[in-house]
From Swiss-Prot:
It comes from the Eukaryota. This is 3-phosphoinositide-dependent protein kinase 2. Its EC number is 2.7.11.1. The gene is PDPK2. Residues 12-25, 355-369 have a biased composition (Polar residues). It comes from Arabidopsis thaliana (Mouse-ear cress).
Length: 486
């Protein structure tokens, strides 16, 4: 089992060697964490909706039972971390978050652990993800995009001045406070530079992970695909992709697979919509320069050159956080939820409501049930699944997915039929593990999409969370909703 007592304790001692007159001297330096390890268990919290799901972690809304304080609780699976050699990333994220102090970065309050999991209690951003605002509005106005990107620039300047590269800037990692200000989250891929002002573990700034692929495919710069060392320019490329997505509603290199996305990135195959202003087009074009040293913010002028760009004309950089943010588009699924039920565990009326694509998929509602097959992704359907169908029943959509629980996950085959039925099957034992009660009423059966890979199927009695590695979450939503409205 993973041992992280030292890294998650109240004090950390770093060992290092130095040389004096040819002799090697062992030195140590210790510092106290501002966010200490507490003697809590997850039973001390009322766990609510899932904010996000990663490869080895989940972030859930957690209310402390004794005082009512709400946190975003990051729950990390020790076994998976050890198996996948992610220990260094977890340690580094904890150490870095403890030392960062900026209004545009999520705050770490405390940590705790048990035999199975590590827990980090983070600031809860009740406004959801910037990704949500883009999808609910279709795309953002230029004024909205200018405000949000300016706050990202402000936080990135601080991060880079501290000698850190975030390496996973994207709309899903840009969280919003209840009043609408941006906070950068998820430092699980952070990379400290040699001159970092952050106290880190020995060798954290010099190991070979600087050239390792991390981040998200659609936002990865070409130099990373060519195995070049990480630079601050990596984050500036991702900023350009994010600004493009704010203004257009989609990422600039979107394609059907990661391989195709990478080919478009390497070829710099980018098309600007006609509604982009000249200033917006120019800034994005410069941020997406194939030479990372030429991106605004990465050159000798630093962030001054980025802040002076015409796109940011009128931005009051000194008083940015005191400005009035754009109005947040509410989640339609949460409007009918009564206030007193807010935060109740697994409340299907608003579970996961910080990341729902309610505006997507509506174009398919008028299609007949016979045309649903155009939406469906048939994932290696063969005779193994035929045995689970009733006479005359046919498959409309099927995928190998992970069924996610609070801590663990299990591979299942999710099947939607024309009856209609929704079932999930254990692919190894070939037995039905669950039958999701069908209803044409969206109040009794609805799908909530939190990312291209993650979605929830909600019924009055339970909420089932799934991960589709082939990023067909939205297709599942469309297929089910089209069948409901046939």
């Amino acid at each position: 089992m993973l041992t992280m007592d030292k890294e998650f304790d109240s004090k950390l001692t770093l060992q290092g060697n130095s040389s004096s007159n040819g002799e090697t001297i062992s030195r140590s330096k210790s510092f106290a964490f501002k966010a200490p390890q507490e003697n809590f268990t997850y039973h001390d919290f009322e766990l609510g909706k899932i904010y996000g799901v990663g490869s080895y972690s989940k972030v859930v809304r957690a209310k402390k039972k004794d005082n009512g304080t709400v946190y975003a609780l990051k729950i990390m699976d020790k076994k998976f971390i050890t198996k996948e050699n992610k220990t260094a990333y977890v340690k580094l994220e904890r150490i870095v978050l403890d030392q960062l102090e900026h209004p545009g970065i999520v705050k770490l309050f405390f940590t705790f652990q048990d035999t199975q999991s590590l827990y980090m209690a983070l600031e809860s951003c009740e406004g959801g993800e910037l990704f949500d605002q883009i999808t609910r509005k279709g795309r953002l106005s230029e004024d909205e995009a200018r405000f949000y990107s300016a706050e990202v620039v402000d936080a990135l300047e601080y991060i880079h001045n501290m000698g850190l590269i975030h390496r996973d800037i994207k709309p899903e990692n840009l969280l919003l406070t209840l009043d609408g200000h941006i906070k950068i989250a998820d430092f699980g891929s952070v990379k400290p530079m040699q001159d970092s002002q952050i106290t880190v573990l020995p060798n954290a700034a010099s190991d070979d992970k600087a050239c390792t692929f991390v981040g998200t495919a659609a936002y990865v710069p070409p130099e990373v695909l060519n195995s070049s060392p990480a630079t601050f320019g990596n984050d500036l490329w991702a900023l350009g992709c994010t600004l493009y997505q704010m203004l257009s509603g989609t990422s600039p290199f979107k394609d059907a697979s990661e391989w195709l996305i990478f080919q478009r990135i390497i070829a710099r195959d980018i098309k600007f919509p006609n509604h982009f202003s000249e200033a917006a087009r120019d800034l994005i074009d410069r941020l997406l320069d194939t030479d990372p040293s030429r991106r605004p913010g990465a050159g000798s002028e630093g962030y001054d050159s980025l802040k002076r760009h015409p796109f940011f004309k009128g931005v009051d950089w000194k008083n940015l956080r005191s400005q009035t943010p754009p109005k947040l588009a509410p989640d339609p699924a949460s409007q009918s939820a009564s206030p007193e039920r807010d935060g109740s565990p697994w409340n299907p009326t608003h579970v996961g409501d910080t990341s729902v694509l309610q505006n997507d998929g509506h174009n398919g509602l008028s299609e007949s049930s016979g045309s649903i097959t155009r939406l469906a992704s048939i994932d290696s359907f063969d005779s193994r699944w035929q045995q689970f169908l009733e006479p005359g029943e046919s498959v409309l959509m099927i995928s190998a997915v992970k069924k996610l629980q609070k801590i663990t996950s299990k591979k299942v085959q999710l099947i939607l039929t024309n009856k209609p039925r929704l079932i999930y099957v254990d692919p190894s034992k070939l037995v039905v593990k669950g039958n999701i009660i069908w209803s044409d009423n969206s109040n009794d059966l609805n799908v909530q999409v939190s990312s291209p890979s993650h979605f929830k199927i909600c019924t009055p009695k339970k909420v089932l969370s799934f991960e589709d590695a082939k990023q067909r979450a939205l297709q599942w939503k469309k297929a089910i909703e089209t069948l409901q409205n046939r």
